[in-house]
Amino acid sequence: MDILLANVSGLQFKAERDLIEQVGAIPLPFYGMDKSIAAVCNFITRNGQECDKGSACPFRHIRGDRTIVCKHWLRGLCKKGDQCEFLHEYDMTKMPECYFYSRFNACHNKECPFLHIDPQSKVKDCPWYKRGFCRHGPHCRHQHLRRVLCMDYLAGFCPEGPSCKHMHPHFELPPLAELGKDQLHKKLPTCHYCGELGHKANSCKQYVGSLEHRNNINAMDHSGGHSGGYSGHSGHIEGADDMQSNHHSQPHGPGFVKVPTPLEEITCYKCGNKGHYANKCPKGHLAFLSNQHSHK
């Protein structure tokens, strides 16, 4: 009835024009003031650029390149204002993903403002299954989606093209970027003892054989197999200075055990006599005095 009596659809009142042009909007007295409850600036949404008032504009400036909602703005703690690189507008589809739901597949906050994404929607299609066969079978961590094969494409040409409702298989090998770490070929280990591929040093046959040979020689040394009354580990440590002379003359290699110096050639550094180590010197702790008298 109002349209029949007084049709004003073609008229524009001054108040409407003032609202569109934002007439009477007072600039902000301070920079960085909170504008979270203010309306959206019409000029920036219309032109896609900053309005004439700039950062002093009392309205919010929303840009299209901001696709994620600012988590600090949700709590009223964002200090960047219009200079923030995130979106200052509550949009559930543009919210960041909930950490607890993505990590533990559960979020106990009934009013959680963050986005809950189903883990099944994150699973990518298996590139090998698309090609025709996946050796992992049902244990593959990628999604195996069954599709009906397009017989026209298999014959050589499909008139529907990409809009075909049936599956167009790809016979080329999937690129490395689409493969997971478990689908890549594992690098063979290298033995640090013999340098061969396929095994590690702890399972190397050459290393095990040389280790057994070394243990047999050590057992013979401890049982008194060498003449001269060699006294085991303690004598070996004390006579290390005298055995350094034979260190460079003896060859080294896998499975080689250095033969200790005979006791007759050992020189006691306390008294200067041969035939015993310093820890078994018969002159005791004052043996260095007799060593000084002998030099005089």
UniProtKB/Swiss-Prot annotation:
Protein keywords: Developmental protein, Endonuclease, Hydrolase, Metal-binding, mRNA processing, Nuclease, Nucleus, Repeat, RNA-binding, Zinc, Zinc-finger
Tissue expression remark: During oogenesis, expression is detected in the germarium, in nurse cells, in the oocyte, and in the somatically derived follicular epithelial cells (at protein level). At oogenesis stage 12, nurse cells degenerate and their content is transferred into the oocyte. In larvae, expressed in all organs and disks (at protein level). In the larval salivary gland, expression is initially confined to cells at the anterior end but later expands throughout the entire gland (at protein level).
Intrachain S-S bonds: none
Annotated organism of origin: Drosophila melanogaster
Cited Gene3D superfamilies: Zinc finger, CCCH-type, Zinc finger, CCHC-type
Predominant place of localization: nucleus
Localisation per UniProt entry: Nucleus
Name of the protein this chain belongs to: Cleavage and polyadenylation specificity factor subunit 4
CCHC-type zinc finger segments: 189-206, 266-283
EC number from the UniProt entry: 3.1.-.-
A single GO BP: mRNA processing
Function in brief: Component of the cleavage and polyadenylation specificity factor (CPSF) complex that plays a key role in pre-mRNA 3'-end formation, recognizing the AAUAAA signal sequence and interacting with poly(A) polymerase and other factors to bring about cleavage and poly(A) addition. Has endonuclease activity. Binds RNA polymers with a preference for G- and/or C-rich clusters. Binds single-stranded DNA non-specifically.
One Gene Ontology cellular component annotation held by this UniProt entry: mRNA cleavage and polyadenylation specificity factor complex
Gene Ontology MF, one: zinc ion binding
Subunit structure: Component of the cleavage and polyadenylation specificity factor (CPSF) complex, composed of at least Clp, Cpsf73, Cpsf100 and Cpsf160.
InterPro entries (UniProt xref): CPSF4/Yth1, Znf_CCCH, Znf_CCCH_sf, Znf_CCHC, Znf_CCHC_sf
Domain notes: The N-terminal region containing the five C3H1-type zinc fingers is essential for endonuclease activity. The C-terminal region containing the two CCHC-type zinc fingers confers a binding preference for RNAs that contain G- and/or C-rich clusters.
Stretches for region Disordered: 222-254
ZnF C3H1-type: positions: 35-63, 64-91, 92-119, 120-147, 149-171
